[in-house]
């Protein structure tokens, strides 16, 4: 059995889709469906069972036996970069993750988890090393601290000449693609621009967006990276992006190209994002490629075109 926490979320459900495409259906989905709209991400997927996050965590902490587990993909988290309740974020993203990690280590279960490019903050160097990290928000800090916790475990194991079972963290950059419709304001720029176009409006970008560049990575490619590491059992913390920053304008151009009409309008940059907003991200893929991962990433033009075709099907 494979367990996917956050399995009703965007990345988790796309990992399940990729597993299903391999014929794997013995999957336990763990999630928190207070946002009931997320159920739509599971409707077309084949799974063995569903469990509420709180019930699952209680059983993990009690050391309950789930039978043989091939791997756990830990995608469940509070992923809102605008959430400033630090106690809530640290409990969900840090404390819960530690409990699940130690459950896996005790049983030698491969543990593949979601980190984030939000760990880097305002920098132009995105290498998976502590000197380049400095989160701008509580979400990024929670992910940074869990990465550091994992690093300490690796260091301690090395000092005691021990070998730990697989632990693999993925620093997701700006992920976009199918199964994100439940995310509200946290959905991708491509999603929001498409909605604006379908409402008969022009696509709207923040003032200065021509200078904002992000590493936009298609969710299907993210799922492929996860499965590559499942197959190869490589431990480490790895960037998961295309390695090429592209502007928000490029996203808008791709959406406009699909719809065949429209032009970009600018709106004022919101005050609540000032000082907590990454203006530039670009994954350094040196470590990912050195591990042997050969997944090829779609450009914005390629990925957005595929995405638009999927979400605009009649």
From Swiss-Prot:
It comes from the Bacteria. GO terms for biological process: ADP-L-glycero-beta-D-manno-heptose biosynthetic process; lipopolysaccharide core region biosynthetic process. NADP(+) binds at residues 10-11, 31-32, 38, 53, 75-79, 92, 143, 175, 183. Substrate binds at residues 174, 185, 192, 206-209, 214, 277. CDD domains: ADP_GME_SDR_e. Its cofactor is NADP(+). Pathway: Nucleotide-sugar biosynthesis; ADP-L-glycero-beta-D-manno-heptose biosynthesis; ADP-L-glycero-beta-D-manno-heptose from D-glycero-beta-D-manno-heptose 7-phosphate: step 4/4; Bacterial outer membrane biogenesis; LPS core biosynthesis. The keyword Protein biosynthesis does not apply. This is ADP-L-glycero-D-manno-heptose-6-epimerase. Homopentamer. It is an enzyme of class 5 (isomerase). Keywords: Carbohydrate metabolism, Isomerase, NADP. One of its GO terms (molecular function) is NADP binding. It catalyses: ADP-D-glycero-beta-D-manno-heptose = ADP-L-glycero-beta-D-manno-heptose. The gene is hldD. HAMAP family: Heptose_epimerase. SUPFAM superfamilies: NAD(P)-binding Rossmann-fold domains (SSF51735). Belongs to the NAD(P)-dependent epimerase/dehydratase family. HldD subfamily. Catalyzes the interconversion between ADP-D-glycero-beta-D-manno-heptose and ADP-L-glycero-beta-D-manno-heptose via an epimerization at carbon 6 of the heptose. Contains a large N-terminal NADP-binding domain, and a smaller C-terminal substrate-binding domain. Binds 1 NADP(+) per subunit. The keyword Chaperone does not apply. It comes from Vibrio cholerae serotype O1 (strain ATCC 39315 / El Tor Inaba N16961). Signal peptide: none annotated.
